[in-house]
Regions:
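Glycine-rich phosphate/diphosphate-binding loop of Rossmann-like nucleotide-binding domains
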Residues: 45-61, 67, 196-266
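N-terminal beta-loop-helix "entrance" segment that forms/cooperates
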Residues: 72-95, 272
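Buried hydrophobic positions in well-ordered alpha/beta secondary-structure cores of metabolic enzymes
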Residues: 50-53, 106, 177, 218, ...
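Glycine-rich phosphate/nucleotide-binding loop
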Residues: 84, 272-335
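Short hydrophobic alpha-helical segments enriched in small aliphatic residues
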Residues: 18-20, 28
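Extreme N-terminal starter segment of soluble prokaryotic enzymes
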Residues: 39-44
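N-terminal glycine-rich phosphate/adenylate-binding segment common to multiple enzyme folds
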Residues: 87-201, 287-289
Length: 336
């Protein structure tokens, strides 16, 4: 996971660095000057979270410390509570103090949030007090509207991939760009009883500005990859998807080198297992991206190898493994 996160971060231009020892043609003095100029002082807020989260974050810190020594960086850490750990200690999934600490940081490194939804007492609480409510609130407070989820098949994991060898072929490498702060998860919701019948309502809302900014991110990433964007929607049914498709087509005009195709979400779910090699950047809304990114992660052979970044319109980001909290193996020291 950590190696993939570093590779992924460089690809997305979220870490500015100079790889000193590969600067062919530069003198030793010039390399040392480049090394000095690339040194960073970083303040990273860590959210160990729940389940295996604390174990994962502890190992990640060890790797970051080695990187800091190797390249002369200075990294300071501040741990904050979120999710179930915060509920147990503070009575709420995310405190104002934790939000302030995250806003003051250069980046956030998160482990995992939540527990067993069937047995944990956290899930007997009202929805706004459950572990995941803290993560949703943090995304909104930090304006983390762009979620990047790579799905890459390592040759060492080919045998773990559930797809046939003729489908895998030469492997696949895709990036799922998911809008993260709009749509169904952030719309108005209610549950009420009318004439003796319980009715639940969730609202799916998108503005053209919300769609435009995630589309720009998606096309920017595509320019650094194989220059293809697959925009996924449900435009044959949903008004929000018809607006999505219209705005994405407008953004595409500014990227003539990028090939744009539209795909309905149900077809995309099928194509991910039928021919994953066809995808480069998948651009989609919040709920569709939530589902498709988990599906894509499983055809790689192990979700434990995959990373996730949630970004705003600056270089700030929240970085985490794609896997869950795995409470059944927490504390055993066997988490990947």
């Amino acid at each position: 996971f950590l190696c993939n996160l570093l590779k992924f971060s460089v690809e997305c231009n979220m870490i500015e660095y100079v790889y000193i020892y590969s600067l062919a043609g530069f003198s030793a003095k010039e390399k040392e000057i480049a090394r000095m100029n690339s040194r960073m002082n970083l303040n990273i807020v860590c959210i160990p979270g729940d389940g295996i989260g604390p174990e994962i974050v502890a190992e990640a810190k060890k790797v970051l410390d080695k990187v800091a020594v190797k390249f002369g960086h200075s990294i300071s850490y501040k741990d904050i509570l979120m999710g179930g750990a915060s509920i147990d200690a503070c009575g709420e999934p995310l405190t104002d103090e934790a939000i302030a600490a995250a806003k003051a940081a250069d980046a956030v490194l998160m482990g995992s949030i939540g527990g067993n939804t069937s047995t944990s007492p956290w899930y007997q609480l009202p929805p706004h007090l459950r572990p995941e409510a803290g993560l949703l609130k943090l995304r909104k407070e930090l304006n983390l509207f762009a979620n990047l989820r790579p799905a890459y098949l390592y040759k060492e994991l080919r045998e773990a991939c559930p797809l046939r060898e003729d489908i895998i072929g030469g492997g696949f490498d895709m990036m799922i760009m998911r809008e993260l702060t709009g749509g169904l998860y952030f719309g108005e919701r209610s549950t009420r009883t009318m004439n003796g019948v319980v009715t639940a309502v969730d609202t799916l809302t998108y503005t053209e500005n919300e769609i435009r900014r995630i589309a720009i991110k998606g096309f920017d990433i595509a320019m650094k990859r194989r220059k293809k964007v697959t925009s996924v929607d449900k435009a044959n049914v949903l008004d929000s998807s018809r607006l999505w498709r219209k705005v994405v087509e407008e953004v595409a005009l500014d990227y003539p080198e990028v090939t744009l195709e539209h795909m309905l979400v149900d077809n995309c779910a099928m194509q991910l297992v039928k021919d994953p090699k066809q995808f480069d950047v998948i651009l989609t809304e919040n709920m569709f991206g939530d589902i498709l990114s988990d599906e894509a992660s499983m055809v790689t052979g192990s979700i434990g190898m995959l990373s996730s970044a949630s970004l705003n319109d600056t270089k700030f980001g929240l970085y985490e493994p794609s896997g869950g909290s795995a409470p059944d193996i927490a504390g055993k020291g066997i988490a990947n």
